[in-house]
Amino acid sequence: MEQAPEDQGPQREPYHEWTLELLEELKNEAVRHFPRPWLHGLGQYVYSTYGDTWEGVEAVIRILQQLLFIHFRIGCHHSRIGIIPQRRGRNGASRS
């Protein structure tokens, strides 16, 4: 029977340290794009649902990633990423 290879040395970075760094980066980015009361409400919701646990940290990361992805995809005015409506000439004609 095949077995998974054994761990070939130490991890590059501990999971919890990496997770907290990712959370900090996402929070800093979210503050630039969303109102603070919304983010505070998100934090309150996650805390009331998960308490002070790693599942809560992972939930905040997952939700912030989804919010930022959608925000950029729709067309953030702070970013070059996203869908930006094309300007059209009169009667919808495009300039080719």
UniProtKB/Swiss-Prot annotation:
Q: Name one Pfam family in it.
A: VPR
Q: How is it modified after translation?
A: Phosphorylated on several residues by host. These phosphorylations regulate VPR activity for the nuclear import of the HIV-1 pre-integration complex.
Protein name as annotated: Protein Vpr
Q: What is its main location?
A: virion
How the protein assembles, per its UniProt entry? Homooligomer, may form homodimer. Interacts with p6-gag region of the Pr55 Gag precursor protein through a (Leu-X-X)4 motif near the C-terminus of the P6gag protein. Interacts with host UNG. May interact with host RAD23A/HHR23A. Interacts with host VPRBP/DCAF1, leading to hijack the CUL4A-RBX1-DDB1-DCAF1/VPRBP complex, mediating ubiquitination of host proteins such as TERT and ZGPAT and arrest of the cell cycle in G2 phase.
**Cellular localization per UniProt:** Virion; Host nucleus; Host extracellular space
- What segment(s) does the record annotate as region Homooligomerization? 1-42
Record's function text: During virus replication, may deplete host UNG protein, and incude G2-M cell cycle arrest. Acts by targeting specific host proteins for degradation by the 26S proteasome, through association with the cellular CUL4A-DDB1 E3 ligase complex by direct interaction with host VPRPB/DCAF-1. Cell cycle arrest reportedly occurs within hours of infection and is not blocked by antiviral agents, suggesting that it is initiated by the VPR carried into the virion. Additionally, VPR induces apoptosis in a cell cycle dependent manner suggesting that these two effects are mechanistically linked. During virus entry, plays a role in the transport of the viral pre-integration (PIC) complex to the host nucleus. This function is crucial for viral infection of non-dividing macrophages. May act directly at the nuclear pore complex, by binding nucleoporins phenylalanine-glycine (FG)-repeat regions.
Organism of origin: Human immunodeficiency virus type 1 group M subtype J (isolate SE9173)
Q: State which residue ranges cross the membrane.
A: none
Gene3D superfamilies the record matches: 6.10.210.10, VpR/VpX protein, C-terminal domain (1.20.5.90)
State the remark under miscellaneous: HIV-1 lineages are divided in three main groups, M (for Major), O (for Outlier), and N (for New, or Non-M, Non-O). The vast majority of strains found worldwide belong to the group M. Group O seems to be endemic to and largely confined to Cameroon and neighboring countries in West Central Africa, where these viruses represent a small minority of HIV-1 strains. The group N is represented by a limited number of isolates from Cameroonian persons. The group M is further subdivided in 9 clades or subtypes (A to D, F to H, J and K).
Q: Name one GO cellular component term.
A: host cell nucleus
Q: What is the lineage of its organism?
A: Viruses, Riboviria, Pararnavirae, Artverviricota, Revtraviricetes
Mark the residues carrying the PTM Phosphoserine: S79, S94, S96
Q: Which gene produces this protein? A: vpr
Q: Which InterPro entries match?
A: RetroV_VpR/X
Entry superkingdom: Viruses
What's a GO biological-process term for it? symbiont-mediated arrest of host cell cycle during G2/M transition
Q: Which UniProt keywords apply?
A: Activator, AIDS, Apoptosis, Cell cycle, Host G2/M cell cycle arrest by virus, Host nucleus, Host-virus interaction, Ion channel, Ion transport, Modulation of host cell cycle by virus, Phosphoprotein, Transcription, Transcription regulation, Transport, Viral penetration into host nucleus, Virion, Virus entry into host cell
What is stated as this protein's family in its record? Belongs to the HIV-1 VPR protein family.
